[in-house]
Regions:
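Active-site core of PLP-dependent enzymes with the aminotransferase class I/II
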Residues: 1-4, 32, 187-192
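Active-site C-terminal subdomain of aminotransferase-like
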Residues: 22-26, 32-103, 109
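PLP-dependent enzyme catalytic core of the Aspartate aminotransferase-like
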Residues: 147, 153-206
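Conserved PLP phosphate-binding loop immediately N-terminal to the Schiff-base lysine helix
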Residues: 1-22
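Short loop segments at secondary-structure junctions
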Residues: 18, 33-38, 145-148
């Protein structure tokens, strides 16, 4: 999804980078703080890395935050994970978010078509519970599998498909689990989705 946090008048936002930004487990998080809060004396978990960098090493007793989102930093970031993150962001910059979003809508739309076609052919064993409107979703689709969902997940995994599994909600009587899948526009292709459809179809037949 394309974000416009400032334009949306968002106060604060935070996110991880390990999955969709390709930075790996344990990588740095990101944070957004609207500029109207930059000079406010808000309660915060303050760290020395958020102190005014021109006076940081004076070791004064009072915290003097930087006038930006940097003021919410606690300590210096880990160098090795930052290097991986930088390389990942360079790839996104080269590809361009407009192009990635356009491909994402087409690729995820194609996956939804494939899933609905296969589900109808097998008596609707699963339902896509992700919003149908492309503007209301990213590239991930979640399937609510009515029966034998874990077995279906295991079969897909054995066939080289990287998806993940969420156990049924224990607070309800519904015993349907969820399989989540995401055709990532940076490196997945329409052929990948087509081949996945064949694997899923064969898995349901077996």
């Amino acid at each position: 999804l394309k974000l416009d946090l400032h334009g949306w008048n968002t106060d604060f936002a935070c996110w991880c980078s390990y999955k969709y930004l390709n930075s790996g487990p344990g990588s740095v998080a990101g944070a957004f703080v609207h500029e109207r809060h930059h000079r406010e004396k808000l309660p915060r978990f303050a760290g020395w890395w958020g102190h005014d960098k021109n006076e940081r090493f004076l070791m004064e007793p009072e915290f003097k935050p930087m006038a930006s989102a940097e003021a919410w930093q606690l300590s210096n970031a880990p160098v090795f994970s930052m290097a991986v993150h930088r390389a990942a962001l360079d790839l996104f910059d080269r590809a361009g978010m407009d192009a990635l979003r356009a491909k994402s809508e087409e690729l995820t739309g194609y996956l939804a078509f494939v899933l609905k076609t296969i589900s109808a052919a097998h008596g609707d064993p699963f339902t896509i519970i992700t919003p149908d409107d492309p503007a209301q979703r990213g590239c991930q689709l979640s399937l609510l599998v009515r029966e034998n969902g874990r077995a279906l997940f295991d079969t897909l995994t054995r066939n080289g498909v990287v998806v993940d599994w969420r156990e049924p909600d224990p607070s309800t009587s519904l015993r349907a689990g969820v399989i989540r899948m995401a055709p990532v526009p940076l490196y997945n292709s329409f052929e990948d989705v087509f081949r996945f459809g064949g694997i899923l179809d064969n898995a349901l037949r077996s």
